[in-house]
Amino acid sequence: MKLIIASNNAHKITEIEALLASISIDLPVVSLQEIGDVPEIVEDGTTFEENAVKKVETIAKVAPNDYILADDSGMSVDALNGEPGVYSARYAGDHDDQANIDKVLQKLAKVPNEQRTAHFNSVIALHSPKGSNLIVNGQVDGYITESERGQDGFGYDPIFFVPSMNKTFAEMSASEKNTISHRGLALQELGKKLPVWLKGE
């Protein structure tokens, strides 16, 4: 029995593995690439939760005896009526971080700083071999900067500013980001709920 991370995103897998290490999941962790032939996951849900559940249940069809963890996450900008939301990864087309950043900055070009509020959300679904799902979520609030700042991270990290840290995600170390990020908060919540959930399994 193992824990499969239902993602091909190397950055996301590295981040999740680091966070899983902190909550002591006693299972070997593998990525989708390591389990071979998997069906295509169509992320056509209208919410992060729908997409996360769709990922774990799709992979469960080919790995019914394993635990499967999937995250669906994205950034919602208030001045853009919640965009990019569930379309965060493909906001400007096919998974192009720079194009996505450029599109957000362009759309916010005339929006004053105080109205550039945004939120990063992560919903994590953990699917058990018995077919039940544990759902947790995390949210971090911030602002969209007027230009990119920082060299680390991925996705929208260079333009997502967190006031409590006085930095963008891309200006933070991995450990700083993992402590306060949406995915980090969701995994911390998973760590709290997991022991009780596993007893019920």
Curated annotation (Swiss-Prot):
<keyword id="KW-0546">Nucleotide metabolism</keyword>
<comment type="function">
    <text>Pyrophosphatase that catalyzes the hydrolysis of nucleoside triphosphates to their monophosphate derivatives, with a high preference for the non-canonical purine nucleotides XTP (xanthosine triphosphate), dITP (deoxyinosine triphosphate) and ITP. Seems to function as a house-cleaning enzyme that removes non-canonical purine nucleotides from the nucleotide pool, thus preventing their incorporation into DNA/RNA and avoiding chromosomal lesions.</text>
</comment>
<dbReference type="GO" id="GO:0000166">
    <property type="term" value="F:nucleotide binding"/>
</dbReference>
<comment type="subunit">
    <text>Homodimer.</text>
</comment>
<keyword id="KW-0547">Nucleotide-binding</keyword>
<keyword id="KW-0479">Metal-binding</keyword>
<dbReference type="GO" id="GO:0046872">
    <property type="term" value="F:metal ion binding"/>
</dbReference>
<dbReference type="Pfam" id="PF01725">
    <property type="entry name" value="Ham1p_like"/>
</dbReference>
<dbReference type="InterPro" id="IPR029001">
    <property type="entry name" value="ITPase-like_fam"/>
</dbReference>
<feature type="binding site">
    <location>
        <position position="177"/>
    </location>
    <ligand>
        <name>substrate</name>
    </ligand>
</feature>
<dbReference type="GO" id="GO:0009117">
    <property type="term" value="P:nucleotide metabolic process"/>
</dbReference>
<dbReference type="GO" id="GO:0005829">
    <property type="term" value="C:cytosol"/>
</dbReference>
<protein>
    <recommendedName>
        <fullName>dITP/XTP pyrophosphatase</fullName>
        <ecNumber>3.6.1.66</ecNumber>
    </recommendedName>
</protein>
<feature type="binding site">
    <location>
        <position position="72"/>
    </location>
    <ligand>
        <name>Mg(2+)</name>
    </ligand>
</feature>
<dbReference type="GO" id="GO:0036220">
    <property type="term" value="F:ITP diphosphatase activity"/>
</dbReference>
<comment type="similarity">
    <text>Belongs to the HAM1 NTPase family.</text>
</comment>
<feature type="binding site">
    <location>
        <position position="73"/>
    </location>
    <ligand>
        <name>substrate</name>
    </ligand>
</feature>
<dbReference type="InterPro" id="IPR020922">
    <property type="entry name" value="dITP/XTP_pyrophosphatase"/>
</dbReference>
<dbReference type="GO" id="GO:0035870">
    <property type="term" value="F:dITP diphosphatase activity"/>
</dbReference>
<feature type="active site" description="Proton acceptor">
    <location>
        <position position="72"/>
    </location>
</feature>
<feature type="binding site">
    <location>
        <begin position="154"/>
        <end position="157"/>
    </location>
    <ligand>
        <name>substrate</name>
    </ligand>
</feature>
<dbReference type="InterPro" id="IPR002637">
    <property type="entry name" value="RdgB/HAM1"/>
</dbReference>
<dbReference type="GO" id="GO:0017111">
    <property type="term" value="F:ribonucleoside triphosphate phosphatase activity"/>
</dbReference>
<keyword id="KW-0378">Hydrolase</keyword>
<dbReference type="GO" id="GO:0036222">
    <property type="term" value="F:XTP diphosphatase activity"/>
</dbReference>
<dbReference type="GO" id="GO:0009146">
    <property type="term" value="P:purine nucleoside triphosphate catabolic process"/>
</dbReference>
<feature type="binding site">
    <location>
        <begin position="182"/>
        <end position="183"/>
    </location>
    <ligand>
        <name>substrate</name>
    </ligand>
</feature>
<keyword id="KW-0460">Magnesium</keyword>
<feature type="binding site">
    <location>
        <begin position="7"/>
        <end position="12"/>
    </location>
    <ligand>
        <name>substrate</name>
    </ligand>
</feature>
